Swiss-Prot record:
Membrane topology classification: Multi-pass membrane protein
EC code(s) of this entry: 3.6.1.27
Residue spans crossing the bilayer: 19-41, 56-76, 117-137, 144-164, 208-228, 229-249, 251-271, 285-305
Chief location category: membrane
Further remark: Bacitracin is thought to be involved in the inhibition of peptidoglycan synthesis by sequestering undecaprenyl diphosphate, thereby reducing the pool of lipid carrier available.
Lineage, top ranks: Bacteria, Bacillati, Bacillota, Clostridia, Eubacteriales
InterPro entries xrefs: UppP
Protein name: Undecaprenyl-diphosphatase 2
An annotated GO BP: regulation of cell shape
Role this protein plays: Catalyzes the dephosphorylation of undecaprenyl diphosphate (UPP). Confers resistance to bacitracin.
Originating organism: Clostridium acetobutylicum (strain ATCC 824 / DSM 792 / JCM 1419 / IAM 19013 / LMG 5710 / NBRC 13948 / NRRL B-527 / VKM B-1787 / 2291 / W)
Catalytic activity: di-trans,octa-cis-undecaprenyl diphosphate + H2O = di-trans,octa-cis-undecaprenyl phosphate + phosphate + H(+)
Pfam families the record matches: BacA
Record flagged with keyword Transmembrane helix: yes
Length: 307
């Protein structure tokens, strides 16, 4: 009984950290490494080894889904509107002789006249770079870089880059809405998202910086980052669940449910306040925080507290 209570307590802590950090430009990975090492909730840690590495991976997937659900709830009107057939499919009553064919005309007309078509097209093309690089190389990247020193380096490099990019590009950014983002800008932002394959860099930070560089304002860049997370995380979760089957005990199932709910509720609050913050304040405070966390990860790694 006592062991189960301790387990649920650890689950709650993990859910809170996931909900707080998943969509902030501070790297949820860095925080999960620190917390997991301290409380013994990581692969190979004795208190959790009873539950197995597969369960830990599944738990990480499930709490990410909780955070994703928060985005779906907060932006339901936008997502639902973009899925309406009236906003998604252009009318092609007449075939115009444009030299690009029916399919080309359908795409061009849809992109230029249908908000939903444009929205999902931008999301899809922005996801392609990370899929192309991530699918074949993610395991190799993690094997090389999923250690305290590389994660700390990513945290600190990202912090310096964030300060530089904000000072140079933020004031130039004129695109204030996700609906104004062009397909070229979406592709570039998607390429920047690939930097998050380096553990500790932060997908949110990478995409927001990429958005600044191509002229997209902070709030629009952050929201586009949120929308990108939906297919990326759902896809990664589905892939993991297809490849792995785990027989769960009642306590393990309870742990998944609690972690999911905690991550959902915390992310719901954090994302809403994060957007309000970005409307008024610069992001350098997150850069300073990243530097501090990077130093902590380095020290803990050097002293063998985390590994």
């Amino acid at each position: 009984m006592y062991t189960n209570l301790i387990f649920i307590f650890k689950i709650i802590l993990e859910g809170i950290i996931e909900g707080v950090t998943e969509f902030l430009p501070v790297s949820s990975t860095g925080h999960m490494i620190i917390l997991g090492s301290i409380i013994g909730f990581k692969e190979g840690a004795k208190p959790v080894s009873l539950y197995g590495a597969e369960y830990i991976h599944m738990f990480e997937i499930i709490i990410q889904l909780g955070a994703i659900l928060a985005i779906v709830v907060l932006y339901w009107d936008k997502i639902f509107s973009a899925l309406k057939p009236s906003n998604l499919f252009p009318s092609m009553k007449e075939h115009e002789k444009s030299g690009i064919g029916v399919v080309g005309e359908f795409f061009v007309k849809g992109y230029n006249t249908m908000p939903g078509f444009k929205f999902w097209t931008n999301i899809v093309v922005a996801c392609i770079p990370a899929i192309v690089i991530g699918l074949p190389f993610q395991k190799k990247i993690d094997k090389l870089l999923f250690f305290p020193a590389p994660v700390a380096a990513a945290l600190m490099v990202g912090a310096v880059w964030m300060i530089f990019a904000e000072n140079k590009y933020r004031k130039r950014a004129k695109i204030k809405s996700v609906d104004e983002i062009t397909i070229k800008q979406a592709i570039v932002i998607g390429c920047f998202q690939c930097l998050a394959l380096w553990p500790g860099m932060s997908r949110s930070a990478s995409t927001i910086i990429g958005a600044w560089i191509v002229g997209v304002a902070t709030v629009a860049g952050a929201e586009f980052s949120f929308f990108l997370a939906i297919p990326m995380m759902l896809g990664a979760s589905l892939l993991f669940l297809i490849k792995n089957s785990v027989v769960l005990s009642s306590v393990q199932i309870l742990g998944l449910a609690v972690g999911f709910i905690v991550a959902f509720i915390v992310a719901l609050v954090v994302v809403d306040r994060f957007i309000s913050f970005l409307k008024k304040k610069p992001m350098r405070i997150f850069a300073v925080y990243r530097l501090a966390i990077g130093i902590i990860v380095l020290v803990l790694g050097f002293t063998k507290v985390i590994s």
